[in-house]
Amino acid sequence: MQGKIFILPKDSTNQQFVELSHPLTGRPLRYLLTNDHLLQILQVGDSSKQRSWFVGDHVVSDGYLYVCTPIDLLALVLPIIQELTWSRRKEPNRYVSFEDFIEHFDNMGPHYPRVSEVLSPNLLNTLHRICKVNEPVGSLPKTFQLDESSVVKILLRKAKVAQENLPPSIVTELKKQLAPLDLRTPLPQDLLELSCKWHAASLVCEDLQPEWYNKLAYWQEELAPLHAYTKNLEESRKILVEKEALLNSKKRPQNSDITSSLLKKPNRKQATKKSKYFSGEGMTKISSFFTKK
């Protein structure tokens, strides 16, 4: 049976697929739009093994799970409002209305108008979170301008939550990367905490332009001990590998070259050369055995 198994949040209704551009790469990605959320589709499964699902009396040949999780619209809104309200020098220089924003948003692709139609309140709320707001005056509408400090505060809060909820598998991998060469030396917990913080910030900013990760770099000085430790650890591991290679070369038997040369078979040229010195003097010619008597 053809089909796929999707896991959706509870009470999700009116699901429909939409294709939007990834905010960082521009690559088209498929999302699931519901009545109040835009869901990212994550494919879960082992590609090296062929699996299927039993659903009732049917077999679904596609053995993957497709987990749909709500995404923060900040990733979609941020590059658009930045382009509209900041100069090319990345400096705020004007305000725009919500209608101007929606017009630009809808021109991003054929499925964007459907998203703005369903999630208009969500988009407006996102603008309020990351922008300076000029309230309407008379006939002039409410206008918005991207506020860098608001975005940075949101990203820092997200990074803190991500750090506190890193999967155990990631923490274990970070411990391996920081493990001292001397097993008797304990792993510095302060450096592990810094590594988790750094990794969490990278996860939060992975769908954003690199400049936003760099804007969190006020704590780069805090990361200096981590960078120094990992650099020294890398150099120490390199020296250890070189020492092991040198030790293995010294363990090789000294007469191994002599033994191998004695076991070599003479090549054809050597055999031909030796045959030149063979003499058949005193031997009866083979033709003499065939003479008539």
From Swiss-Prot:
One of its GO terms (biological process) is RNA catabolic process. Residues 265-276 have a biased composition (Basic residues). Its main location: nucleus. One of its GO terms (cellular component) is ribonuclease H2 complex. InterPro entries: RNase_H2_suB (IPR040456), RNase_H2_suB_wHTH (IPR019024), Rnh202_N (IPR041195). The keyword Cytoplasm applies. Keywords: Cytoplasm, Nucleus. It comes from the Eukaryota. It is found in: Nucleus; Cytoplasm. Residues 251-278 are annotated as: Disordered. PANTHER family: RIBONUCLEASE H2 SUBUNIT B (PTHR13383:SF11). Component of the RNase H2 complex. Non catalytic subunit of RNase H2, an endonuclease that specifically degrades the RNA of RNA:DNA hybrids. Participates in DNA replication, possibly by mediating the removal of lagging-strand Okazaki fragment RNA primers during DNA replication. Mediates the excision of single ribonucleotides from DNA:RNA duplexes. Belongs to the RNase H2 subunit B family. This is Ribonuclease H2 subunit B.
